[in-house]
C-alpha cells in the first residue's frame, strides 16, 4: 500500500495481494497483517489503497488483473476485491478463471460406467463468482479491469 508508481507509467498490472491474516511474508510491523488487525481496516487501509495506487500508475486504456480467492478467514475477499477495483475507478471487463489443481495422489472416484472424476473439494472458497458451468470444481477468479 506504500508503493505509488509514477502516474500513468504502467502498461499492465497483475497482482495477487496477500490474504489478510492468512499469508505472512515477514514479521516486520509494516506488514499488512500486523498493521491492520480487523478485516474492514485491512480492506480499506491495504487492499483499496493498493488497488487505487495501481490505478494511478496504469496508463489510460490499459488493463489490470487481480488474482484472489475467498478463504475461510475472509469469505468475502473476492467480492471486496472486485468492489475495491470499481471504487478505485477501474471498469470491470472480464473474469478469468484459474483452475486449481487437486492434491497429487488424491483418490479418484470411479462410476459404474468406469468414468473417473476428480474428488470433490469439501471447502468452497468461491463466493458469488463461482463458475456456474463447472459446479464443484475449485477455481480462483482473476478480475480484469481497464482504466
Where are these regions (language model features)?
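Mobile active-site "lid"/loop adjacent to the S-adenosyl-L-methionine
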Residues: 3, 9-50, 72
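Short conserved AdoMet
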Residues: 5, 59-60, 147
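Short coil/turn segments at beta-strand junctions that form active-site/ligand-binding loops
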Residues: 8-9, 62
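Short, low-complexity, polar/charged sequence segments that are solvent-exposed and flexible
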Residues: 15, 32-34, 83-87, 112-114
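Conserved Class I SAM-dependent methyltransferase catalytic core
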Residues: 40-101
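Class I S-adenosyl-L-methionine
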Residues: 72-82, 90-147
